[in-house]
C-alpha cells in the first residue's frame, strides 16, 4: 500500500520562486487599476491624521539609491500608519526650478541663455523638468511607493508660485527682506550667488603665502621705518581688495628684529613662522597686546592704499601669524568686522571671476591667473616672505563641483536676525530623531548669517519687487503682492518675464517717495531653497487631505542645513512656529568598506539593476534592514544576503499556507482552552511579536522590525515550532483536534505576518493575501486590512518561562545528537533514542511532559532516568544546564514506513506490518471513515 497517500502533505499554489521582477509589475497594475491609494484614503476618512510631508526631490536625472532609501522609508511609515488607524495621505512633490535644470537645458538643447528669448528658455527648462517628473514618478511607483501620483505638488505650478511670493511678501512686510552689498558664496562657473546649503567642502590645493605689510604710522608705539606686519593667506587674489589687518584684542604680539628689518606677529606663532622662513637669529624688540596696536596704519604692498589695524574676536592662533588679512568684499567675517570700522567693501571681480578695472594691474585676469600674478608682483616688490602650497578643506559648488569664492555683490537677503530667537525656540519644541539633530540645527540657526535669497539666473520664481524708474525706491506691499499672485495663478511666473513692469503693477500704483508711475522690475530670481522651503504653506496648508503643521519631515541629514532649515525659516517668519512636529533623518550611502558611493570609485549600486535582477521587494527589505540613522551600506554582497533573508521569510509564509490547504477558518479553528500547550506557547510568542514589531514601527526602528520578524521566522517558527508540529500536521487524522489546533496557530500566524510585513514587503504580501484560506469578504488588498492587535488572553508569562527552559533542554539534546551523528553514523534524528539523566529539580520539571519529550526533541524515544542514576561515559553536560546529562543511542525497533519513527510497535498490526501502532490506528480510522 502507498502510505504516502494517507499523509496530510502540504500543498499550495503559492509559488516557491518569487520571480519578483516579472510578478511585481502585475501587482503594480492591480493597485493602479483598483485605485488602492484612493480606497485606503476613503477607508480611513475621519480617523486621526498622520501627515508625512514629502521633501521634493530634484527633477533632474534618473533615481539613484539615495532616492530609493528615502522614498521607501517614507512609504513604510505611511503604510504602517494607514493600517494602524490613521488617515495617512501621501502627496509626493518635486523641486522643479534651479540651476541644474538650466544647465541641462543649455547642454541638451544647445541653447545660449544669454542669447535666447528668456520666456522661450524658461519654457524649455519647464519641459525638461516635467520630463523628469514623469520619469521619476514611474520609477518611484515601481518601488511600490503608494501615493497620490496623479496629483503631486510641483514647485513650478502657478498656484504654488503664487503662494511662494505671498510668503516673500509677508516676510518683506515684517522687515525681514532687505537688499545689501555683502560678500556671498559665488560660483564663477554658474555665475550666481549660492546659499550656505548649496556649498559642500572638499580638499583643494591652494597657494600659501606670508606677506609683509610695511608700517606707515605706528602711532608712536615703535619706529615705523623698516617695520612690517606679517600676514598669511591662501587666497593671494584677494590681496588687491585688502583694506585692513585684524588682530585679536587680547593676544600678545611681538615686534622682532630680523637682520635689518622688524616684523610684527603673534608671540605664540613666532617660532613656527621663523622656522618656515628659515630664520634662526632674531631679537624681540617690543611686546604689545592687540588692543594697543589698534589704529596702526600699514600700506597695501600691491595697491596705493592704506591698510589699517583693526580688532576682531575671530582671529585665532591655529595657523598663520595672528595678523589676519582683511578684505570685506571677500569674506563674511571680514565684512562683519569691517562694518564696525566703516571700511570700504571692495570686490573687483565680475560674475565670471575676472578682475575688473578696479583691480588695477590685474584687470582682465581670472582668479587662478591673478593668484600667480599677485605672487610674482609681491616677490618683485620685496614683500613676499614665503611661498608654498597647502591642502585644505575648501568650499565647492554642490552643483558643478567647482571651487567657489566669497564675493561682495548687491543681493537680496532674508534677515535671520529678525526671527532667530523665535526659530531657536521653535527648534526646541520639535522632536528630532536621532536626538543629535536638535543640536545640529540649533547651532546652525544660532550661527547662521543672513540668508542670501537672490540668484542671478533665469529658471526660477522671480523676486517680486519693483523699483521706481525715477528715484530707484524699492516697492513691495500688499497690493503689489496680491496683484502678482493673481497674475501668477492665471499665467504662471512666466508672466513676470513676458511683460513689462507697467503691465505687472496694480492699477494706480505710485511711488510713495516721488509719486512717479514709471517702474522697472527686479531681474533676479529666488534661491530654490526658498521654493521648497515654501512647501509647507503651498501644500500642507492648501490641500484638503493634508494639515499644517506636518507630523513628520524625513530626509537625509544634509537637510539640517537645507530643506529643514529653509522650511523652518519661512514658517517661523510668517507663522511663528516650525512646520513640523517631528524630524527624522537618515544617513548617507556607503559601500561595505564605509566609503562614500561615487562614480570615480565605481562602487555605486543602480536601483534599476537591483529591481531588474532581484525585485523591488529586495530593495525594500534592504532599506528596512539598515539602521538608517547611521550611514547605510549597500553592495552586491549585501543585496545577496538580503535576498537570502527574503527567501527565508517567503518560504516560511509558503509553509504556513501549504499546511492550511484543508483548513476552513469558519469551522476548523480551535479555541484557546482546547489548544495543545505547545500551540498556546506559539500563540503567546505571536502576541509578543505583534507588540515588539508595533513598538518598533512606532519608533521608526525598521531594522528592529526586520530582525524581529526574520528571527521569528527562522527561530520561533522554522527551528522550533514548525519543526515540532510537522509530525502532527502530516500524520495525525486530518480533522483531529490536535491537528486543527496547530492549523489554528498557522492561520493566526500567517494573518499576522502578512500584515506586519506589508509596509516593507508590499508586493509579496499582496501576493500572499490572495492565497489565504477562507474569508470571501476579505478586503481586495492587504493594504486595506487592519493592523494586528495583541490578543492578551494568549499572553502567558508562566508558559513563556516554562518553554524557555524546555527549549534550553532541546538545544542541549540537539548538540548531543549532532555529536552522535559524527561518532555513531546516526543519520536522521528519528533513528535516535535520547537518555536524559537529570538532577531532582530537572526530573520534576521534565517528568510531566512524558511522551511529549520525544516529539519536542524530534527523536523516536526519550528515556527520563531517575535522579541519581549515573550517566554513561561519553554523555554530554552543558554548562548552561548543569543539572542534566544527555546520552544518545540508536532507537530500538523498526522504522515506520508512514511516520519514519523507529518503534518497537512496528509490525504489531498484521494488517499493516510496516507501520507503528499509532499509524496503523490512524490508517484504519481513515478507512473506516471512507
UniProtKB/Swiss-Prot annotation:
Enumerate the UniProt keywords alphabetically. Answer: Aminoacyl-tRNA synthetase, ATP-binding, Cytoplasm, Ligase, Metal-binding, Nucleotide-binding, Protein biosynthesis, Zinc
Q: Which terms in the GO cellular component ontology are assigned? A: cytosol
Q: Which Gene Ontology terms describe the biological processes this protein takes part in?
A: isoleucyl-tRNA aminoacylation
Q: Name one Pfam family in it.
A: Anticodon_1
Q: What is its main location?
A: cytoplasm
Name the protein family. Belongs to the class-I aminoacyl-tRNA synthetase family. IleS type 1 subfamily.
**PANTHER family xref list:** ISOLEUCINE--TRNA LIGASE, MITOCHONDRIAL, SOLEUCYL-TRNA SYNTHETASE
UniProt protein name = Isoleucine--tRNA ligase
Q: What is the lineage of its organism?
A: Bacteria, Bacillati, Bacillota, Clostridia, Moorellales
Instruction: State which gene encodes it.
Output: ileS
